[in-house]
């Protein structure tokens, strides 16, 4: 199936980044969120990113204009969803919220449309089961920032068809990404490796082994990481990190995935 028009649900950092990737890849893209101010902020962020590419000589002014013309933003979901080939959900990492969105997308999108989730940890099988088209539901997990990071995890739920998985995989390749096909396990691969490392860094801080700055220096200077695990935790959001750890802990029942008490305390404090 050829993908020509894409709907991205959620105009935050991830959603707007995904919309930018799709538009730069030649897709007509509709960016949707629940309030106009969120949509405007997302589109403004994309314009800023594109302007930087022009300044750096990585894109011509004409190319920027063409990409911008392929983008539009809306609040009303009904009209936006009626003629798309692919819908990508990129909202808060909460299963109830995602299920509600997929039920609505299922009722609004054309029968042929693929419904993809940018979830970083939640089960695609459970999300797909809320729809009448589970064979056309898959994971399409971009990493932050989406326009820069090459990796895309393409996740096959229990009912996801091979055709759906291959279509999304090929689309990611078309955008110049490095997609990988994965089975539906908690945290997939990226977050199953990365988030426990961040949790362990938090545990090291909790035990007073080193300061936050020193822990991040170890990761950057010793492992060659561009960003330390605690700085990365702040960028991702401690609440999101805690949620992912809870998904891993519940999904595997393994104590190595137990969230650090300090992480839980920080989230309770609103940090």
Enumerate the predicted regions with their spans.
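Amphipathic alpha-helical segments at domain termini/boundaries
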Residues: 20-23, 65-86, 167, 172-176, ...
